[in-house]
Design a protein with these regions (language model features):
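Short glycine/threonine-rich catalytic loop with a Thr-x-Gly-x-Asp
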Residues: 115-122
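Cys-dependent protein tyrosine phosphatase-like superfamily
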Residues: 1-111, 123-168
Length: 168
């Protein structure tokens, strides 16, 4: 059963580098609690509480290992583990985009996290924007994604966006 808190911590804390991709529908963030030496158990719990209290219906983790997935369950948040695979990128992207599209079409508010909010996760989200037809032009999709990220994308991220339409 989900733990319910009272008082000033009842709403949790916003996950680090939380960024809306599609306002009130799809967001990205750093792994709740941080990663590596910066990982903190209490911070993880507070960030998962924030995700729950802000109505996210599903967390999708793209990190390689299934770390902390049980914490979502303990706090009453649905989670899916979809480890990013660069080895067969097109197959992974096609499957990921279809699943994400179905979640969003069903009205589920989704947050996707990697270890950090870097070009990998930003490129994957920019690719989704293009794949879903939310932006009609490759160059425009790159520009929109760079605005969301607040910086220029690396070649990997740009390539994901450029190849997204052929994955439909």
């Amino acid at each position: 059963m989900a733990t319910r808190l009272r008082g000033r911590w009842a709403l949790g804390i916003t996950p680090r580098n939380f960024t809306w991709i599609l306002k009130d529908k799809l967001a990205i963030c750093e792994r709740p609690g941080g990663y590596g030496e910066n990982h903190r158990r209490v911070r993880r719990q507070e960030e998962i509480i924030w995700i729950r209290e802000n109505g996210f219906g599903c967390v999708v983790s793209i990190i390689p290992a299934p770390h902390n997935l049980h914490n979502y369950d303990e706090l009453g948040v649905a989670a899916r583990h979809r480890p990013f695979s660069a080895e067969d990128l097109d197959v992974w992207l096609k499957s990921f985009y279809r699943e994400l599209h179905e979640l969003l079409r069903a009205g589920t508010k989704v947050v996707v996290h990697g270890e950090e909010v870097g070009d990998r996760i930003v490129g994957v989200m920019g690719g989704y924007i293009r794949w879903a037809g939310l932006v009609d032009d490759d160059t425009q999709a790159i520009t929109v994604t760079e605005r969301l990220a607040g910086r220029q994308l690396d070649p990997f991220a740009r390539n994901v966006i450029l190849t997204a339409t052929r994955l439909r």
